């Protein structure tokens, strides 16, 4: 299975490299990339050029920031890469569990969105997700032993 990973980066060369290398450890899922490099001055361009992955690189001038960079990357992906089964939006500093997508592969389904829980370096949950109940009331969800599916 091929997944198009989409992210914006700025001056986090080593974190970006580590994130991409962790994704590369999956055996049954291949990742290609659309990346907005928003004016990095730390050698990110050179590092990305040396990576052994298929990368569409969009260069910004430092004024896109994360939100506009992601918009530009998503619009590019929709126009140039409409044939991918899955798009994955990520941050440039995400530390993926090695092989996690191989484990998640049986859960992939057409027309579904998957959201992974986020943990800090200390292993504590920092974000899982929320489900709106009514009005402004919601219930928080963290990483659980059992999968949670919402309609």
Predicted stretch roles:
Residues 37-46:
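A conserved acidic beta->alpha catalytic loop
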Residues 60-78:
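Glycine-rich, basic loop-to-helix element that forms the pyrophosphate-binding segment
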Residues 84-95:
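Short beta-strand-to-loop acidic/aromatic patch adjacent to the donor-nucleotide binding site
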Residues 115-130:
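Short beta-strand-to-loop element that shapes/binds the nucleotide-sugar donor at the catalytic cleft/hinge
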Residues 130-151:
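Short, flexible, basic/aromatic active-site loop/helix in glycosyltransferases
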């Amino acid at each position: 299975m091929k997944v198009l990973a989409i992210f914006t980066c700025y001056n986090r060369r080593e974190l970006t490299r580590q994130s991409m290398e962790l994704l590369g450890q999956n055996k049954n899922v291949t990742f290609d990339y659309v990346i907005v490099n928003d004016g990095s001055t730390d050698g990110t361009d050179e590092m990305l050029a040396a990576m052994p992955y298929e990368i569409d690189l969009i260069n910004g001038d430092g004024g896109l920031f994360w939100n506009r960079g992601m918009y530009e990357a998503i619009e590019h992906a929709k126009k140039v890469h409409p044939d991918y089964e899955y798009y994955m939006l990520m941050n440039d500093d995400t530390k993926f569990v090695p092989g996690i997508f191989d484990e998640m592969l049986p859960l992939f389904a057409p027309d579904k969105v998957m959201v992974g829980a986020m943990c800090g370096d200390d292993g504590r949950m920092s974000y899982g997700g929320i489900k709106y109940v009514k009005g402004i009331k919601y219930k928080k969800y963290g990483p659980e032993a059992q999968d949670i599916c919402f309609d």
